[in-house]
Amino acid sequence: MKENKIRKNKEFRHVYRRGKSYSNRLLVLYICKNRCNINRLGVSVSKKVGKSVIRNRVKRLIKESYRLNLDENMKKGYDLVFIARNSSNDRDYKDIESALINLLKKAGIYN
């Protein structure tokens, strides 16, 4: 699972510059093709969302909803960066999950 993460600032910047963005009221998705046969995930939560406990909770919810919906219906070979908006700080798992699936469908990589 380690190779499935975007960690370095350089990798995040590459996705922001080269990628296409999709958004809804809770999340923003930047998506960019990579040269691998796997999808890599990056999650970013600004300090505007809340204190560290809230930011970490939002990150965990995004990662878990991605993990549980990662299946053979999703196209491979993309770098995905999810950015949480301020309104996501008081949402529950179902809201985050539906927003995430909505963005993946908008991007055309989830059937």
Curated annotation (Swiss-Prot):
GO BP annotation list: tRNA 3'-end processing; tRNA 5'-leader removal
Annotated EC: 3.1.26.5
Gene3D superfamilies (alphabetical): 3.30.230.10
GO molecular function: 3'-tRNA processing endoribonuclease activity; ribonuclease P activity; tRNA binding
Catalysed transformations (reactions): Endonucleolytic cleavage of RNA, removing 5'-extranucleotides from tRNA precursor
Gene Ontology cellular-component annotations: ribonuclease P complex
Keywords: Endonuclease, Hydrolase, Nuclease, RNA-binding, tRNA processing
Function: RNaseP catalyzes the removal of the 5'-leader sequence from pre-tRNA to produce the mature 5'-terminus. It can also cleave other RNA substrates such as 4.5S RNA. The protein component plays an auxiliary but essential role in vivo by binding to the 5'-leader sequence and broadening the substrate specificity of the ribozyme.
Family: Belongs to the RnpA family.
Subunit structure: Consists of a catalytic RNA component (M1 or rnpB) and a protein subunit.
Name of the molecule in the record: Ribonuclease P protein component
Native organism taxonomy: Bacteria, Bacillati, Bacillota, Clostridia, Eubacteriales
Protein encoded by which gene: rnpA
